[in-house]
Amino acid sequence: MVGYDPKPDGRNNTKFQVAVAGSVSGLVTRALISPFDVIKIRFQLQHERLSRSDPSAKYHGILQASRQILQEEGPTAFWKGHVPAQILSIGYGAVQFLSFEMLTELVHRGSVYDAREFSVHFVCGGLAACMATLTVHPVDVLRTRFAAQGEPKVYNTLRHAVGTMYRSEGPQVFYKGLAPTLIAIFPYAGLQFSCYSSLKHLYKWAIPAEGKKNENLQNLLCGSGAGVISKTLTYPLDLFKKRLQVGGFEHARAAFGQVRRYKGLMDCAKQVLQKEGALGFFKGLSPSLLKAALSTGFMFFSYEFFCNVFHCMNRTASQR
């Protein structure tokens, strides 16, 4: 059970254990889904249509993009920006899950609402994600820059990237795309947590008793379903965020096709609609859905697994 559980036999994890479980969950998930993230970002930043019929398009499908990136940049390209991405995932996972557990407990103790309700999980999940985003957003900008650059590289190391970006674009560069990120992350994370809880209830109702023994599989499947639902409903805002994060980085994007500049969130949405059509809002959706299913599934699976491990350790220690 993710979130505060008022039942007497609920998990009794400490806040430190919750943070560790969230961190490890982020670390494991990031290592597994990094290739999908790189492909998704390349698709999102390509202004040309993702179609073979457009001769100027560099990428037009998941398999074609995978082969081309592999041929041009080698297998390590699928883990470009992996160091800042891991820092991002570890920090984000810790803050998000710790905040969510604390917020749901606060709601249960300080209001008439049940901490396990859909609406409570939606609001608490969204707020927890916003707190985590504010904490790690500078690292997210670095990760996007590393994943977006082709060859020759603009940034060689993390330290080089931080220094170059600070000198050429100022300190505000590390919070580029923050507004659309917060706007997108609240409903996305809120739907992740609330849909995960709802799908678990549905799973328990629909699956016979003998099929409920494997709780890990249940967590993985429900997490994957929650990831697909939440990503589909909030995807355009994620695309705007990525486009805005590479503002000022246009020289490194020239090798991938057209280059555009955006004045802000609304201007970005307007230009995408005018020049790429409504389907432009969903560029990169297919790898994103695959990534969302895997990442959200593994995120909840890993978090629940390590929380259960800590719970068993605590119970054993208390019985001595």
From Swiss-Prot:
Catalysed reaction equations from the record: thiamine phosphate(out) + thiamine diphosphate(in) = thiamine phosphate(in) + thiamine diphosphate(out)
PANTHER family for the chain: SOLUTE CARRIER FAMILY 25 (PTHR24089)
**Residue(s) carrying Phosphoserine:** 51
Q: What does the record say about tissue specificity?
A: Expressed in all tissues examined except for placenta. Highest levels in colon, kidney, lung, testis, spleen, and brain.
Effect upon mutating residue 192 to H: In THMD4; reduced protein expression
Q: Give the disease entry from the UniProt record.
A: Microcephaly, Amish type: A disorder characterized by severe congenital microcephaly and severe 2-ketoglutaric aciduria leading to death within the first year. Thiamine metabolism dysfunction syndrome 4, bilateral striatal degeneration and progressive polyneuropathy type: A disease characterized by recurrent episodes of flaccid paralysis and encephalopathy associated with bilateral striatal necrosis and chronic progressive polyneuropathy.
A Pfam family recorded for this sequence:
Mito_carr
At which residues are the Solcar repeats? 13-106, 116-202, 214-309
Q: How does it sit in the membrane?
A: Multi-pass membrane protein
Q: What is this protein called?
A: Mitochondrial thiamine pyrophosphate carrier
- Impact noted for substituting residue 231 to A: Does not affect thiamine pyrophosphate transmembrane transporter activity
Q: Superkingdom of this entry's organism?
A: Eukaryota
Q: Which GO terms describe its biological process?
A: deoxynucleotide transport; thiamine diphosphate biosynthetic process; thiamine pyrophosphate transmembrane transport; thiamine-containing compound metabolic process
Upper taxonomic lineage: Eukaryota, Metazoa, Chordata, Craniata, Vertebrata
- Compartments, as annotated in UniProt: Mitochondrion membrane
Q: What is the effect of changing residue 30 to A?
A: Does not affect thiamine pyrophosphate transmembrane transporter activity
Going by the UniProt record, its keywords in alphabetical order are: Antiport, Disease variant, Membrane, Mitochondrion, Neuropathy, Phosphoprotein, Repeat, Transmembrane, Transmembrane helix, Transport
Q: Write out the GO MF terms.
A: antiporter activity; deoxynucleotide transmembrane transporter activity; thiamine pyrophosphate transmembrane transporter activity; thiamine transmembrane transporter activity
| Similarity remark | Belongs to the mitochondrial carrier (TC 2.A.29) family.
Give the residue interval(s) assigned to the motif Substrate recognition.
241-246
Q: Name one GO cellular component term.
A: mitochondrion
